[in-house]
Design a protein with these regions (language model features):
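Structured, non-membrane catalytic/scaffold regions adjacent to prosthetic-group chemistry
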Residues: 1-54
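Short, flexible beta-strand-to-coil junctions
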Residues: 32-36, 44, 101, 120-122, ...
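Phosphate-rich cofactor/ligand-interacting catalytic cores and adjacent structured alpha/beta frameworks
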Residues: 38-80, 101-104
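Long, charge-rich alpha-helical interaction segments
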Residues: 74-124
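Extended, compositionally biased non-globular segments
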Residues: 104-175
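C-terminal soluble interaction/assembly domains
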Residues: 172-197
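Acidic, proline/serine/threonine- and glycine-rich low-complexity intrinsically disordered segments
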Residues: 200-202
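Conserved small/polar residues in nucleotide/adenosyl-binding loops
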Residues: 204-210
Length: 210
């Protein structure tokens, strides 16, 4: 991360269409090193700005600072059920063990997805089993992924085309396309890391029921 902070001024963003999305996405970037130090890299006035990201969550809009401030509206969320309250002479009982999550936003805007991802990121159980941790990462992504037809943009379906998790110590990407529940692993070996040009990796497309 320290090396990134020193060299980010030498990085230029290319105005080039993403062949999968067929647009030039207004991307913000989240970067984590092997120590767990996480930063956000966001464009501002033609420059890339590196910001410490202590919640370790990011969406493309608005800026990270706005999302952090917005979390104050959801400070009441908790995994335990809310306590019973005596209102006058009436004991108002909590509705169940899930009641602590009442108010967790359920929409697909970036602001709502940021809150959901932050809540799950900081409350899902961690494990010494890396396979379990990997699956938990995909559970978080499931909660913020947009299904086909749920959101339309000018009549066209706007949906999450793939999910991706990176294992920073192993330097491997795990990818789940929209039409498959199978994970595809791409190992970042020295050959890939030394390439100067964009590299595409193919995979075998499976039918949904497979």
């Amino acid at each position: 991360i320290e090396e990134l902070k020193q060299k980010v001024k030498n990085i230029n963003i290319m105005n080039e269409k993403n062949t999968t999305l067929n647009i030039v996405p207004p991307l913000h970037f989240i970067i984590t090193d092997t120590s767990g130090h996480t930063v956000a890299v966001e464009p501002h006035n033609g420059l890339l700005i590196v910001k410490d990201n202590h919640v370790k969550v990011l969406t493309n809009a608005p800026k990270l600072e706005w999302h952090i401030q917005n979390l104050r509206n959801y400070a009441f969320l908790q995994p335990e059920k809310s306590t019973n309250q005596l209102v006058g002479k009436v004991l108002v009982r909590s509705m169940g063990c899930e009641a602590g999550t009442n108010g967790l936003p359920g929409g697909y805007t970036s602001t709502e997805r940021f809150v959901r991802a932050t809540y799950l990121r900081h409350h899902l159980s961690s494990s010494h089993n890396e396979d379990i941790n990997l699956m938990n990462c995909f559970k978080i992504l499931d909660s913020v992924s947009i299904p086909q037809g749920a959101v339309l943009d000018a009549g066209e379906t706007h949906y999450t085309q793939y999910q991706l998790v990176m294992e920073s110590k192993d330097k491997a990407y795990y990818i789940k396309p929209y039409f498959s529940n199978q994970l595809f692993k791409v190992q970042l070996n020295e050959e890939l890391l030394s390439k100067d040009d964009m590299t595409s990796v193919s995979y075998t497309h499976l039918r949904a029921h497979e």
